[in-house]
């Protein structure tokens, strides 16, 4: 699997991105800005990520 931009800084969080179901980009944004907060335009991602945090 290719390393996506931004994941190298947080290699331990790549699993969280995948578990969130919102894709690497939305997962990265949510993780960097405010973990656990609803990501704009990603309702399903938020719901799936809630138990993960």
Curated annotation (Swiss-Prot):
Source superkingdom: Eukaryota
UniProt keyword Nucleotide-binding present: no
Region named Disordered: 1-53
GO biological process, one term: regulation of RNA splicing
Protein keywords: mRNA processing, mRNA splicing
Protein role: Blocks the binding of HNRNPA1 to the intronic sequences flanking exon 9 of the PKM gene by competitively binding to the HNRNPA1 RGG-box motif. This inhibits inclusion of exon 9 and promotes inclusion of exon 10, suppressing formation of the PKM M2 isoform and promoting production of the M1 isoform. Also suppresses HNRNPA1-mediated processing of microRNA 18a (miR-18a). Promotes MYC stability through interaction with IGF2BP2.
Subunit structure: Interacts with HNRNPA1 (via the RGG-box). Interacts with IGF2BP2.
Extra remark beyond the main annotation: By blocking HNRNPA1-dependent PKM splicing, inhibits colon cancer cell aerobic glycolysis and suppresses colon cancer cell growth, colony formation, migration and invasion. Promotes the proliferation and viability of oral squamous cell carcinoma cells.
Protein name: HOXB-AS3 peptide
Species this protein is from: Homo sapiens
């Amino acid at each position: 699997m290719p390393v996506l931009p931004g994941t190298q800084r947080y290699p331990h969080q790549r699993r969280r991105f995948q578990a969130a179901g919102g894709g690497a980009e939305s997962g990265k944004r949510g993780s960097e800005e405010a973990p656990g907060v609803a990501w704009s335009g990603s309702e399903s991602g938020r719901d799936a990520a809630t138990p993960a945090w």
